């Protein structure tokens, strides 16, 4: 089952999510909108298994990468927005 992976503009280009993904769904692409001049991209969402390791690895408190499982959106597990 494919999942939708949303990348938000709080991405700092650290590559933690890319390295955490067991199915290589994510990759870094050039982007001038952040300090690192790169952002995570999800070109292979059909391979996403919904493990959410990318969310756990994200140092910006789940705000950069969110995995949507069907109609359910992920929750930030008690983090305030």
UniProtKB/Swiss-Prot annotation:
Any GO CC annotation of this UniProt entry: photosystem I
Ranges of residues in domain 4Fe-4S ferredoxin-type: 2-31, 39-68
Gene Ontology biological-process annotations: photosynthetic electron transport in photosystem I
Chain positions recorded as [4Fe-4S] cluster 1 binding sites: 11, 14, 17, 58
One GO MF term attached to the UniProt entry: 4 iron, 4 sulfur cluster binding
NCBIfam families listed in its UniProt record: PS_I_psaC
Quaternary structure note: The eukaryotic PSI reaction center is composed of at least 11 subunits.
Name assigned to this protein: Photosystem I iron-sulfur center
